[in-house]
Amino acid sequence: MAVLAEIKKAQEPVEIRFWCDRKFAPQARSIMKNFDPKIPVHTIVAGKFRRYNHMSVARQLLWPSLVLKNLRDMFLVLAGFFQSFVKLIIWRPDVVFTKGGYVCLPVGIAARLLMIPLVIHDSDAHPGLTNRVLGVWAKAIATGAPLKYYSYSANKSVYTGIPISDEFHEFSNRERTEAKKLWKVDVNQPLIVVTGGGLGAQRMNDATAVALQDLLQLGSVVLVSGAGQYDELRSLTPPNSESFQLHPFISKDMASLLGAADVVITRAGATTILELAALKKPTIIVPNGQLTGGHQLKNAAVYMEKDAVKVIDEANMVDNPQILVTTVREVLDDPEAANKMAERFAEFAKPDAARDVADMIISSAR
């Protein structure tokens, strides 16, 4: 959204269309409705090549359901390619911008065959399969981390950082108090926000639910669970109040919620991490070590290397949910150390990233 806002500022009139997979479409439409209702959201059939970082290659090849899903999804990728090819022929855009992920592969290949300039942005510190393929053909590549973490061609790659909204900035004490009032949490208590991203994070949600009563001894808690586990967690947790809130998904005002927080527990999704860096927020990362290529582990390592965040091993959290309480207490009990950690974290923020990526897209258009 930050890039789209910059494009609209720099290039009027402009026609923009947002493409995504069907699973994300409801959230995308909600987000676009708040951003610009005139931007249509289109869905693309797509499949993904499932690979799990915590499993050996041999075990994955001998797992029948995994093999069958991958074979099925090969046909979905092919269907998505033909769908994208037809849509691009009809629309004929001047440039295609992709952010990685399996849905971008058929779109990017179709753009290549139609000679439509392709710009990609790689948020993760480790390129995924889609971006490794599309990076060969892309006209320009923007990266979320320093170029040393990538193998892309240096002559078309730029370290821009990750585009985020200007809503994500360091909050003053007054702004934090106002944000706590907006979210109806106790302004006199530390605020602990737990978020696994838009789709949630089951193991993190489960650990939070187990440790919740002890976390509430440290401050107010807001848990953003994702829609999939919301009903289950609603039956296990207290009603929403000024000390605890459960939300399935937040389509707007996420910046104010994170800005109000005294500490945030999150996954190692690249965009969320950089939003928190821009907020200069003491952050505890629980990377999902099971994801393809271990990209969340690699994302977390970039910041852990600079002592800019605290990192909890997910397996330890599953075995001992109290580690969440211990780590939050460490942050809250030593504000000076937490502030120094947040200052190191803020050094990764790139406030001009959205404008820089927008400039790359506009200049790459044919």
What are these regions (language model features)?
Residues K181, E330, A337-P351:
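A short, well-ordered alpha-helix in the C-terminal region of glycosyltransferases
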Residues K350-R366:
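C-terminal alpha-helical cap of glycosyltransferases
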Residues I116-P117, D262-V263, K280-N288, A308:
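Structural loop-to-beta junction motif characteristic of Rossmann-like glycosyltransferase folds
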Residues N34-K38, F82-F97, C104-V119, R132, ...:
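Glycosyltransferases and closely related glycan-assembly transferases
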Residues M1-F75:
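Glycosyltransferase specificity loop/lid
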Residues D94-V95, G259-L274, K281-P282:
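Acidic donor-binding loop of glycosyltransferase active sites
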